Amino acid sequence: MCTIGTLRLGRHEYLLFKNKDFGRDSFADQIFLSEDVVGIQGVSTWANSDSSQDQFSGFSIGANRYGLFCCDANVREEPATGWNYDLLTEIALREGTDVESAIKAVDRAVGRHPYWCSNLMLVDGVTSAAIEVHGSEIAIERHTERLTRTNHHLLFGARPMDEDTITTESRLSFSRERLTNANSIEDIQGLQASHDSNDKTTGICNHSAHQTVYSYILYCKDGEMSLLVRQGRPCSGSVYHCLTPPIGNQWSQEGEALFRSSYPSDSLV
């Protein structure tokens, strides 16, 4: 389960955030890097307790050289013939140069083959959008300033067979409330670590059936991109690693090596 969202901080300043929740208490990210795109690889086996069975495909979150950011959140693995929605995040970043062209790329993709139900979040230097994916259909919500989603559809509607029917609505409420008053990266970091539920076991930071295993903030100001990433529960006091994605004008083999060696993931050490 995941909580995702966007926030515009100024005319040339914006961010995308994600808390990644898994059916286990730890996880090691895999990275894809090229001159054009950086992506944290998606995994279709997020609910499994056995990491040896993980199947990676697509991107869970990423950015491209044009300053387009995209991430996703699971709703349910329906239809049965659907493909992993992480592939749509990769398509958006490989084929899109901005939010609108990325939406068109996703629409073309679901027209060719159905994908599992999910929420995608996109932001660029002008606007942001949430794409709700429902098999071979999509629905769009646009907002210039801020958006958030969890693990159910708002435009298509929640369903009893959704993967999370327990925490998704409360997490959305908590995220919306905090995002309304957010005006800095520090506010988003506070949101990611928050426990606003009465029993403190969940909130945006999740300690319930699913555990928050990574927190991400992709940030752009005046064309300069950075990735703030933290492994483990964000309320635990662990620090964010601030990395410069080596894409576009920043691309070099040395930059790629530095990014990989600095990224908090046991599998990359």
Map each language-model feature to its residues.
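C-terminal, well-structured catalytic/ligand-binding subdomain of enzymes
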Residues: 1-94, 115-118, 123-269
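A gly/proline- and charged-residue-enriched helix-loop-helix capping module
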Residues: 91-104
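Phosphate-interacting basic helix/loop segments used at nucleotide- and nucleic-acid interfaces
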Residues: 105-115
